[in-house]
């Protein structure tokens, strides 16, 4: 059993200002599951995944690939489907990807 309690969650800064990640797990194919914290106005550049990706917005508002999402919304991307992530407000999202994430921008 793997547990990541919010009360002792470790946050790691990313290469993108205003975006932090708390990694839950990595898998053998380069994918991972994590919670991503985004400050309003922050942006993760256009990218695609070798495998599928699933996103659940835990709170706040984001635009992923031009689709506006709010608390409780779910998004699925197919392998190779390019998208960016823009924080419309402060937000927290759960992200699970099957494989690595090459940035295309």
PLM regions and their residue ranges:
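Short histidine-centered beta-strand/loop micro-motifs
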Residues: 25-26, 34-36, 45-49, 66-67, ...
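Ligand-binding loop in jelly-roll beta-barrel domains
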Residues: 19, 79-105
């Amino acid at each position: 059993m793997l547990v990541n309690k919010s009360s002792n969650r470790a946050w790691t800064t990313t290469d993108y200002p205003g975006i932090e990640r708390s990694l839950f797990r990595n898998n053998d194919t380069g994918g991972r599951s994590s919670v991503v914290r985004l400050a309003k106005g922050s942006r993760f550049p256009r990218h695609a995944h070798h495998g599928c990706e699933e996103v659940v917005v835990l709170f706040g508002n984001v635009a992923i690939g031009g689709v506006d999402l709010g608390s409780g919304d779910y998004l699925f991307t197919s392998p190779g489907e390019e998208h960016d992530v823009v924080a419309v407000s402060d937000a927290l999202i759960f992200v699970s990807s099957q494989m690595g994430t090459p940035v295309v921008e």
